[in-house]
Each structure stands twice: as structure tokens, then as C-alpha cells.
Amino acid sequence: MTTGISSTNNRAERTPPKGVALWWKNNRKGIISPLFGIGGFLLFWQLSASLGLTKLAGPLSLFTEERTRDLLFYPFFDRGGLDKGLFLHAMSSLSRVALGYSLAAIVGIAVGIAVGLNKALDRAFDPLFQFLRMVAPLAWVPIALVLFQNNQPAAIFVIFITSIWPILINTAEGVRQIPQDYRNVAQVLQMSNRSFFTKVLIPSALPYIFTGLRISIGLAWLAIIAAEIVMPGTPGIGFFIWDAYQNSYVSDIVLGVIWIGAIGLILDRLMTWLQKRISSDH
């Protein structure tokens, strides 16, 4: 009798909770498929490096190279100056992105709404906006250095001028796409400008605004990495990669690229989560 009860308890302990089982059933394809894809890519990369098909260090070098292994497992050290762990370099880059991207979001949304509401402004400035958005981030670096004579504000300007255009253009398009029926109802109800803005314009244009914001966060992250590479003495992941290249630390470069990709992915997922959260409230 005791044995039967014990056996039943053991089976109950081995049975996963229904919540976990249901979550795994619903999400396993989304987890297993990427793992196979990433694993296959890493295996191909390591084999290519081991067979001498590429001079790029394989992923195993992150663990076999002592210097890179220390950087991987100890990202928080600070020996002063530019000799910092990767986490601190990443925080330096992200602080610049936060400033430049926030300015781009504020200005881009405000100007985009104005342009979307006013056809004369749209006709006057759309060619200029389309022209400026084609300029590559690196092309803005020397202009920013001439303007500000200092790396920090110059880097923030490069982020701002690179990331503002998707926000501005998508916001303007979202405002232009507000159905005419909504505008007519607002006129019939004699809605105030404030009510029209909060109850009609913003909810209607929000998907377009977030499309611009999501595109721009990626551009902002790419821009700061490029700017840090060519701005000497500026702590950040871009500087870390360039310094590793100059000293022929190939595995350090690989580690830096992994950090860049991981942070970029996190920023994109955060923006997607924020979009779903705010859109559901509207």
C-alpha cells in the first residue's frame, strides 16, 4: 500500500505543471527552430575556422583564448581610462543612444505631425527629408565633429540625425492616413484641437509612429557603433572593436560583435513589447 502511494507521488513529481506543459506546447516550435538555425550556423563557422577556410576566429575561441575568456566572464571591470569591461563599454554606448534617440523621437513625432496636417509644409520639406535620410551615418561624423568640436555631443548628433527620419516620415504618413470620416465626425462634434489630437490623431497614427520608432532604434544603435569606431578616445563598443582590430585580437572582435547583435535584438524586442502594451491601451 505504501509502495503504491509512493509510486503515485513519484509520477506526480515527474509530471510537469499544466501551465509549463501548455507553454512549451505553444512555444516549442518558436524555440527549437531558432536553436537549430543558430547551432547549424555556429557549427559551420567553427568548421570553417578549424579547416583554415577563413582567418576569422571560430566561436570556440571565445573560451580558448584567455584574454577573450576573461572579457566574456568579467564584463564589469574598470581599470581606469578606456580599459573597461564590455558591460561598461555597452553602457557608454547606450547612454549616447538614449539621448540621441530621445531627441529624435521628440522632434520627429512633433515635426511629422505638423507635416502630416499641413499639405503646404509637406510639399515644401518632403524633398529635403528624403534627401537627408539617404546620407549614411559615417558621412555625418566629420560634420558633427566640425560643428561641436567634441566627441560626446558629436556622437549624440550623429545618432539624432540618423534616426530621426524614419520617425518623422512614418509619423507624417500616419497622420495623412487618418480616414476622412474621422475628420468629418470631429468637425460635426466640434471637437477641440486637444480632443482631436488625443482621441483621433494619436490613436490613428500610433501604428505608423511605432513603425518609425522601431526602425530608428536599430539605426541609432548602428550609428553609435560606427561613430565610436572613427572617434578616437571615446569609450563604447565601437571603440572596443576598433581597438581589438588594431591589436589583432580577432576573438575579441567576435565577442564585441556578439554583444552588438545581442543588445540590438534586445532593443528591438523591447520596442515591440512597448508597442503592443501601448496599442492595447488604445
Regions found by a protein language model. Give the residues of each.
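Transmembrane-helix boundary motif in ABC transporter permease subunits
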Residues: 99-129
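Alpha-helical membrane-interface segments at transmembrane helix boundaries
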Residues: 25-28, 87-95, 99, 122, ...
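Periplasmic/extracellular loop-to-transmembrane helix junction in inner-membrane transport proteins
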Residues: 19-23, 50-102
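Transmembrane alpha-helical segments of polytopic membrane transport and secretion proteins
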Residues: 1-39, 269-282
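Transmembrane alpha-helices
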Residues: 157, 161, 193-225, 255, ...
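Generic hydrophobic transmembrane alpha-helix motif, especially the helices
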Residues: 130-166, 173-174
